[in-house]
């Protein structure tokens, strides 16, 4: 008995019509020519009817597409219920708000920039911002027959805000730079710093390749690659750092890692370096074709503008800020930040006395209460001037005493306390600040007849022979 079987070739399609839509019609043909043979098996093919917007019903889930003019970003919940929740963005997060006005969309979904010289309430010097923005922009442009220096060297006095001003400009331009410091320009392994510079450069190039502006930012280049006199040793790594930066400046689109070579060009990455004295660097590195140099010396207006940003939350009047800046003309901008920090010393001292010295560690490091919170101290011009003169006096002590020379020339401590003795701040004052400790009184003048070497506070009983 022959086995019975049926073939599915030429059989009608088993796809349900509901899957293809409710408004689709079926056409039946009487005869189909199939592989040269005539077949009378019924066949159908699916055809979409012409769209008639007037005949659409509420049952059609895509009815709104015919006349939809909304923005997809603002109407993001259109597919709610039809898309797996795994692929739905969380509501209330940026542009995923269900209802957004055009202003909200611009402010949350798009990054917009203003063209003033402030960032987050901080002042950016116009000359500084101009130099940095122009240099970065030029390196991303194709200028006809122009060789643009790859490196911008910003140098000047200590504490003048070079690094901080750079960070403000980067933030204003929407740049997240690849950072390096002078401490990474030396290593126990020969060649490591030069390799690291190339790696960081290529990391920045990869970010640019992905469509986001980036740059390489090296802090205090002269401290890591410069020669500071006879006390510093010039190593192979110093030579290779200078040579690597020179090579990158000459071939910015062909930066290769050691041990490999890739013919594909990498994007050009502008390099920003800061320092205090570029005369310590290798001279061919700082020539004009490779490095564009910018000497940063803030003017009085720049100093006032930066100080307004420092004291912006302290309600210090502008005229008082101007008076403080004019009272300390030879100080760096960093001096005024340290001056503001000194005002909080009184608050911290009061907190320490209330907490107890033995409980400071438990309260600050291992406490459920969290760090202490202070009320903002009132900053008056008198208090700021007082602390300012204290800082200046400490600076003068460092310059005047110079204990290092005495330590190198003498085996013992020597006359390390002679300066304090001459100024009258050695005897008595340190012991009197300790609170209720017993202070032996007596004559503390070595010239007096009844000089008492054990006395720590002068009681006015000194006798002199004339």
From Swiss-Prot:
Keywords: ATP-binding, Chloroplast, Nucleotide-binding, Plastid, Transit peptide
Binding, ATP: 156-163
GO molecular-function term, one example from the UniProt record: ribulose-1,5-bisphosphate carboxylase/oxygenase activator activity
SUPFAM superfamilies, sorted: P-loop containing nucleoside triphosphate hydrolases
Chain positions covered by the region annotation Disordered: 429-454
InterPro entries: ATPase_AAA_core, P-loop_NTPase, RCA-like, RuBisCO_activase_AAA_helical
Compartment list: Plastid, Chloroplast stroma
Any one GO CC term of the record: chloroplast stroma
UniProt xrefs under Pfam families: AAA, RuBisCO_activase_AAA_helical
PANTHER family: PTHR32429, RIBULOSE BISPHOSPHATE CARBOXYLASE_OXYGENASE ACTIVASE, CHLOROPLASTIC (PTHR32429:SF32)
Protein name according to UniProt: Ribulose bisphosphate carboxylase/oxygenase activase, chloroplastic
Task performed by this protein: Activation of RuBisCO (ribulose-1,5-bisphosphate carboxylase/oxygenase; EC 4.1.1.39) involves the ATP-dependent carboxylation of the epsilon-amino group of lysine leading to a carbamate structure.
Stretch forming the transit peptide: 1-48
Similarity comment: family membership: Belongs to the RuBisCO activase family.
């Amino acid at each position: 008995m022959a086995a019975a079987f049926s073939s599915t070739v030429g059989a009608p399609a088993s796809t349900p019509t509901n899957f293809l839509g409710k408004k689709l019609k079926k056409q039946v043909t009487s005869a189909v020519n199939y592989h040269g043979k005539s077949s009378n098996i019924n066949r159908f093919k699916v055809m979409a009817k012409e769209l008639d917007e007037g005949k659409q019903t509420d049952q059609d889930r895509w009815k709104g597409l015919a006349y939809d003019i909304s923005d997809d970003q603002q109407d993001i919940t259109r597919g709610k219920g039809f898309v797996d929740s795994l692929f739905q963005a969380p509501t209330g997060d940026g542009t995923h708000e269900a209802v957004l006005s055009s202003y909200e969309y611009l402010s949350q979904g798009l990054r917009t920039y203003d063209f003033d010289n402030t960032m987050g309430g901080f002042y950016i010097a116009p000359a500084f911002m101009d130099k940095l923005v122009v240099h970065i922009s030029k390196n991303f442009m194709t200028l006809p027959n122009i060789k643009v220096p790859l490196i911008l060297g910003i140098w000047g006095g200590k504490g003048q805000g070079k690094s901080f001003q750079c960070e403000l400009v980067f933030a204003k331009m929407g740049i997240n730079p690849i950072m390096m410091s002078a401490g990474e320009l030396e290593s126990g392994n020969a060649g490591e710093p030069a390799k690291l510079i190339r790696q960081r450069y290529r990391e920045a190039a990869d970010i640019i390749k992905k469509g986001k502006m980036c740059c390489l930012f090296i802090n205090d280049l002269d401290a890591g690659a410069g020669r500071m006199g006879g006390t510093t040793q010039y190593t192979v790594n110093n030579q290779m750092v200078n040579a690597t930066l020179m090579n990158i400046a000459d071939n910015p689109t062909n930066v290769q890692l050691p041990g490999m070579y890739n013919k594909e060009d990498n994007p050009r990455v502008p390099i920003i370096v800061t320092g205090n004295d570029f005369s310590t660097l290798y001279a061919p590195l700082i020539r004009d074709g490779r490095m564009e140099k910018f000497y940063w010396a803030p003017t009085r207006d720049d100093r006032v503008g930066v100080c307004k940003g420092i004291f912006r939350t302290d309600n210090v009047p502008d005229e008082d800020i101007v008076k403080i800046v004019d009272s300390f003309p030879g100080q760096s901008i960093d001096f005024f930040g340290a001056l503001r920090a000194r005002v909080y010393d009184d608050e911290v001292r009061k907190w320490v006395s209330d907490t107890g010295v033995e409980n400071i560690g438990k309260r600050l490091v291992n406490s459920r209460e969290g760090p202490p919170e202070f009320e903002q101290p009132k900053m008056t011009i008198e208090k700021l001037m007082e602390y300012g003169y204290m800082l200046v006096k400490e600076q003068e002590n460092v310059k005047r005493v110079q204990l290092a020379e005495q330590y190198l020339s003498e085996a013992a401590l020597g006359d390390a306390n002679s300066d304090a003795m001459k100024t009258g701040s050695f005897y008595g004052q340190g012991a009197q600040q300790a609170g209720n400790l017993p202070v032996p009184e007596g004559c503390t003048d070595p010239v007096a007849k009844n000089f008492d070497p054990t006395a720590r506070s002068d009681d006015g009983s000194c006798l002199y022979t004339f």
